[in-house]
Amino acid sequence: MKKRWRHTSRLTALAIALAASAALAGGAAKDTNDSAPMAPEASCMCLWQGGFADVQATTDLVATVTVVQGKGNSLDLTVDTILRGREYNETIRLWLQARDYCRPEAELFPAGSRWVMALQRITDTVPGGFDPLTPNISYGRIGDYTLSSCGGYWLQLHDGRVTGNLVDAPRWEHEPKMTPVLLELLSAYIRGEVNREALQEASREDPALRELMLDTSEFLRDVR
């Protein structure tokens, strides 16, 4: 009788422990599901749309810009040259990564840096997109712009040349190895004056071979 009681007690204790464990697991799952939609670290889900040459035509504004300053997930940009589209303000606001928005981090664009960007204008209010308690962390305001991370929507601009995911570069690689391409050539492509192959050829040139050709030309001039 004593052994049977001990056996029953152990089974009862085991059942209580299993029930408690299941309850904790269920509660944890509920907490995770409730917090997931608003988790700031949640990553976005999108398909790669292509390099700059492919995506620029689908956006509202393509321009060379200079970063003035940043606050939260926003940047203030001066519009230096408009390559396609219209914008009458000299300074525009760009909203970048926050929550699960498919946008690059603001830290990638330091003050003073210059870029060629293909931007989308915000035209609709998004429910929950603005929190008055954190006004510098937002989806963005109507009339401002966003920059997508789902393609090569930006190129770095330095000394009149651009680098980045321009044409046929690896997916999700925003700083591929390439030869810097003249901004004038990119502008001509956007205007439809040169084709995609011209951008490909310019970005794939061997810098060493180009330097050798320049040296050879100078040598021939000196000989003459």
Segment roles from a protein language model:
Residues K2-T12:
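Bacterial N-terminal signal peptides that target proteins for export
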Residues T12-A22:
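Bacterial N-terminal signal peptides
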Residues G26-D34, C102-R224:
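Netrin-like (NTR/C345C) domain of secreted extracellular proteins
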Residues A36-T59:
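Short boundary/loop segments of OB/S1/cold-shock single-stranded nucleic-acid-binding domains
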Residues A42-C44, D100, S148:
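Extracellular secreted precursors and ectodomains with disulfide-bonded cysteine-rich loops/domains
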Residues C46-A53, L94-E105:
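N-terminal post-signal-peptidase region of extra-cytosolic proteins
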Residues T58-L77:
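Structural detector for short beta-strands of small beta-barrel domains
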Residues N73-L96:
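OB-fold (S1/OB) nucleic-acid-binding surfaces
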